[in-house]
Amino acid sequence: MAPGDKKQIIFVITTIGRPSSTVVPFKNLEVSEWSYKKGIKNGYDDYRDPPSPKPLPKSKQEPNADDKVGDIEYDEMVSVRDGYYSDVCRLTCTEDTKIFIADHISLWRYIMDNAEKLPNYVVIMEDDNTITGEGFITNLDNITKVLNDNNVDILQLVTHTKLLKDRNSQHLMLLPDLEAFKGSFDVSLSAYIIRQEAVRKLYSYFTNNKPSFDISLEILRIENTLGITRYVVDNDRYVYHDYKLANEFMKNKKNRLSIKSRIDGWIMDNWPSFYHRMYYPLFSVFGKYDITMMFLIAIVIIIGLAIFDINNKLLWLLSGVFLAYSM
C-alpha cells in the first residue's frame, strides 16, 4: 500500500470512560480506542518478565510490602505498568500520571509495530476532548501535508494556556480559520498529531530513560535534544478540551458527600479550568498521598506567616482552615 493510500485513523485513549463516538462524533474515518491494558492483552509491551516460580505455601505467611502499590493489589496489570516509569515515579507520581505514562508509551509501541499500516502522521486524543468541527476531519490530509512540508513533528491540538506560545516564530496556516505557533512551555499530550519518526524517537528515549515525572514535562526538557519540532494550535475551534468532564470524573472518584464536596462542585461548575489546575494532583508521596496546587499554596501561606512572625490569630485560623480544606 502506497503511503498516500493509508487511511487516517484517530486513536482515543481511555481516561474517563467516554465512548469514542462522542469524542469523534463524525463517521468520516476510523476511530480506535486504546489503553495500556489493551496493549498488555495484545502483547504490545516490553516489560512482561517470564513468570517466576511460585514459592511453596507457608503457614501464616507475612504479606510482602512489594506486593502492593499504595492500596492497590500488585497484580499483573500493575506489574507491567510499573515497567513504563522509574522507581522514583513509582513513589512520587500520582495514579493518574502512571496510567497516563503507560497509555501513551504503550500506544507509541503499537504505532511502531504497525508502522506500515498507518499513515505518516497519527492523531492521538484522550477521551476528555471532543472534535467539534467536521472540517478538521475532512481536511486532515491537508493539515498533515502542511506539517510535513514544514518539518513539524508534533502538533498539539489542545493547550492549557494561551500565553506561552512563541508568537515571534513562523506561524503555520493549517486551515483558513486555524493557525499554529511554535510551542513553548505549554506542553500537553491531551490531543496531538505526531509523526511516526517522532514516535520512534520518544519511545526509544523513554525506554532507555524511564520517566520520573509526567512525560509532558520530560518532553519539554528533551525535545530540542531529540530534534523534535512542536507546534500548538491557536484556538479550540475544532478540538475542545472539556475541563468539566475531567473534573466530574475526578470528583466521582472521591465520592464524598460533605460541605467541602459541595463547594468543590460549585467551583467546578463555575470555573472548571481553575478547578482543574488547583485540584489536579501534581505528584504523590509514596504513591498514597496526592499533592495538589491548592495544598502547596496553603503550605506556602503558613510558611510565610511563620517566617514573618505574624501573630494575628485570625490569619492563623483562616490559613489552618484553608490547609484543612486543601487536603
From Swiss-Prot:
<protein>
    <recommendedName>
        <fullName>Immunodominant envelope protein p35</fullName>
    </recommendedName>
</protein>
<keyword id="KW-1133">Transmembrane helix</keyword>
<keyword id="KW-0812">Transmembrane</keyword>
<dbReference type="InterPro" id="IPR004900">
    <property type="entry name" value="Poxvirus_P35"/>
</dbReference>
<keyword id="KW-0946">Virion</keyword>
<dbReference type="GO" id="GO:0019031">
    <property type="term" value="C:viral envelope"/>
</dbReference>
<dbReference type="GO" id="GO:0016020">
    <property type="term" value="C:membrane"/>
</dbReference>
<keyword id="KW-0261">Viral envelope protein</keyword>
<dbReference type="GO" id="GO:0019062">
    <property type="term" value="P:virion attachment to host cell"/>
</dbReference>
<keyword id="KW-1161">Viral attachment to host cell</keyword>
<keyword id="KW-1160">Virus entry into host cell</keyword>
<keyword id="KW-0426">Late protein</keyword>
<keyword id="KW-0945">Host-virus interaction</keyword>
<dbReference type="GO" id="GO:0055036">
    <property type="term" value="C:virion membrane"/>
</dbReference>
<comment type="similarity">
    <text>Belongs to the poxviruses protein p35 family.</text>
</comment>
<dbReference type="GO" id="GO:0046718">
    <property type="term" value="P:symbiont entry into host cell"/>
</dbReference>
<feature type="transmembrane region" description="Helical">
    <location>
        <begin position="291"/>
        <end position="311"/>
    </location>
</feature>
<keyword id="KW-0472">Membrane</keyword>
<comment type="function">
    <text>Envelope protein that binds to the cell surface to provide virion attachment to target cell.</text>
</comment>
<dbReference type="Pfam" id="PF03213">
    <property type="entry name" value="Pox_P35"/>
</dbReference>
<feature type="region of interest" description="Disordered">
    <location>
        <begin position="41"/>
        <end position="69"/>
    </location>
</feature>
<feature type="compositionally biased region" description="Basic and acidic residues">
    <location>
        <begin position="59"/>
        <end position="69"/>
    </location>
</feature>
